[in-house]
Amino acid sequence: MDDGRALTVSRYRHHGQTPHIFGTLSTRSGKVVNLSEKEVSITPMQVTSLSNGRRLPLQWIINAPEHKINLTTRIIKSDMWLPFVIPYWEGPILASGSNEAWGFMQLTGY
């Protein structure tokens, strides 16, 4: 993020179950804070239809209130689907809100 911190958030889901969310927040000094699902949330906002017909949540809101983080992500390019044995979407993202940020997103299981 533009303040020198780095945020990583993972959201694992299984059909019919509540997603498991966790993350880490690294400070400029190198301190790493583990974030539980009580401390960080990630919510899908916009579903995008790809040229192959797949529909994916490619815009998300990420909140970590205790750390004053509230971000909305946006993708740079939508058609980044990789049809491997385990197909997935991956690509660079930007985020704005409490900070300006840039990063990477990977989605599987869609």
Model features per residue range: what roles?
Residues 1-110:
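Structured soluble/peripheral alpha/beta segments that form catalytic or ligand/cofactor-binding pockets
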